[in-house]
Amino acid sequence: MYGIEYTTVLTFLISIILLNYILKSLTSAMDFIIYRFLLLIVIVSPFVKTQNYGINLPITGSMDTAYANSSQLDTFLTSTLCLYYPAEASTQIGDTEWKNTLSQLFLTKGWPTGSVYFKEYTDIASFSIDPQLYCDYNVVLMKYDSTLKLDMSELADLILNEWLCNPMDITLYYYQQTDEANKWIAMGQSCTIKVCPLNTQTLGIGCTTTNTATFEEVAASEKLVITDVVDGVNHKLDVTTTTCTIRNCRKLGPRENVAIIQVGGSEVLDITADPTTAPQTERMMRINWKKWWQVFYTVVDYINQIVQVMSKRSRSLNSAAFYYRV
């Protein structure tokens, strides 16, 4: 009997010793693999050029200097550029091969053929409804028109910034703006917006909630409207919903893959006076206008300087995406 017990104890001790040996061997092997892997990363990392993207996070910050990233020096090798221009440009040029000519000129600046896209829009009003900013870098040419200064500034505010938006049901609810970053943005073929501010008893202030004719009109027959009312006050709205969609939006910060070039005009449109524009800089510039060929030549000549004050983005903007998450 004692022999059996001794044998059991001996077997148990041998098992422990063997297990200990196996664990030590595995630990040594894993250490060897991990160290080799880390050494490989250290050796290879200087030769790898990558760029990190956040998960649906807004990028904010000053545009005084270019954002440094490991692929910045070779931007044109891995990026796309969209150049938006009014229809009158192609009409004035009158050359069916003008885009091919510009593509060859962009090639001299380091942008391969096929990386630059030319996007035509009819006018500022129609462009504001559906911007479609799909490229890594988007440059919008807007010819100055003194009668459209407000439309131009609203479009600039829309596409140069990121907005987080939600639907509004104006038939059931009252709405209020909480702070300066909170705006109501309407888009459509024809947007007429009227508001009626309410007191704490939900009675109209200077208006009757049951009579829209008494509401204050803040926009009439516009395609893009960014409405700002008194913060902290409930409002009842009347909107031409058959031809217009309105959303409750919050400005998150600058959209840094978009730049606007104002063509002509005595001064550059300024949107930095808005207290929600932070930092107080903008990617807007002006070039003299004589002929559209001269405009495009200037853009080609300075395209790399323009891109250096922008930041490549992985998210696009169109009218549908804008409404929910820009």
From Swiss-Prot:
Residues 1-50 form the signal peptide. The keyword Disulfide bond applies. Disulfide bonds join 82-135, 165-249, 191-244, 196-207. GO terms for cellular component: host cell endoplasmic reticulum lumen; T=13 icosahedral viral capsid; viral outer capsid. Glycans are attached at residue 69. Residues 237-239 are annotated as: LVD motif. N-glycosylated. The N-terminus is blocked possibly by pyroglutamic acid. Belongs to the rotavirus VP7 family. This is Outer capsid glycoprotein VP7. It comes from Rotavirus A (isolate RVA/Human/United States/WI61/1983/G9P1A[8]) (RV-A).
